[in-house]
Amino acid sequence: MSSASAAESSAREAYDKVPMPPGFKVISTELEGPVFADSRGRTLYKWPIASLRNGYAGDPKDKSVCEDKVTTKTGGFMSPYPGGLDLPDLDKRKSCVALWPPVVADAKAKPVGDWTIVKRSDGTLQWAYDHQPLYTSHLDQSPGDTLGGTTLFRRGGDTPAERTPVGPPTALPPGFRVEGTLNGRLLVNDKRYSVYVSDQDGPNKSNCTTDVCLQRWLPVLAPETAQPQGEWSVVQRSPGVRQWAFRKQPLYTYSRDTRMMSYDGSDEPGWHNVFAQGGPKHPRSFTVQNTTYGDVLAERNGKTVYFYTCGDDSSDQLSCDTLESPQQYRMAICGGGDWARCHQLWHFVPAAAGEKSDSRIWSIISVDPTTDRQVSAGQAGSVRVWAFRGRPVYTYSGDKEPGEFRGHSMGEWQGRRNGFRAFWLRVI
């Protein structure tokens, strides 16, 4: 799989300018592309209603169900687990509003474009975008942080009702879309099949004209009415035949692609996937291992790296994947409730002395190994470990050789609800 060019890696995803109320702005982020933010630069999130195994959770349109009341019982959404069970650490548990502060609207605020105002149960006013009430996350500390939620991992119907960042539409002609991946913001067509560019083409000029080339590479045709816009231009292949180009590079689909969002075409010499912006750089000491399933991220010795994902079964659907969350969830999966066994099987990925991160998405945090809680850097007895989106990453002792991924999908519903997942850069 070819990587993005240096120019593409540094480029930022263009977006449509949309009307916004005073006090809001758009910020470019490493993982999510352009997102809406408040006056302090805090990313805005939505919590759309989602169908779970046994009911629904999340905000219906034009209504917030995130309340300033501590939920104490499970909701029974993930059958066969019953509702009404006590949630862990109730003495420390916080309300939905404490973790997800609503974006409050002033009494004199007026709707603007797709921005509307909803009334909360306590009478306060809250901003909504496209009918979805908006929130900030207590996890975000700096402008441009997106630690509260991500659109990156699509884990299916067994996932919690997740919060995700909200942003303006990407600046695209009809027939295209952008998909978030670990490699970057991937450009695909409206059927979610990858588009590609060729090193043999010139600026706004296609050199794929032979029958041999055109049997494998299909020009992405532009309609007669298509007009250049922003980073998009139109190439005249022949009289009446027009082709889309992005950043002056003519676009193609690959006739041998059998799956959506494929990287197979980039295996052909001189051909590359296209990214609206490149992805965050993983730690320099990490490696990429070729496996029977695809390309997986690994640490310096080739051991697969995993992230932990967790959402509780309350009506609030709060995440439980951070080190400040109740650790009972992780202990149940990684060690059957046995702390020592968990630490024997799953290990934090240590950061070497002097190692630094080249991105904001990957960071080095300090952890107290006796409590698994994050502590201040340099605290006596702490260890420096790698984290993705503020959450530590792990290796699994069951992986004996580079490229093994025995820990992938370990947990409830293949790790989608509460468990461990590998960082797949490519699936074959």
Per-region residue spans from a language model:
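C-terminal segment of classical bacterial N-terminal signal peptides
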Residues: M1-S5
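Compact beta-sheet-dominated domain cores in extracellular/mature segments
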Residues: A6-I428
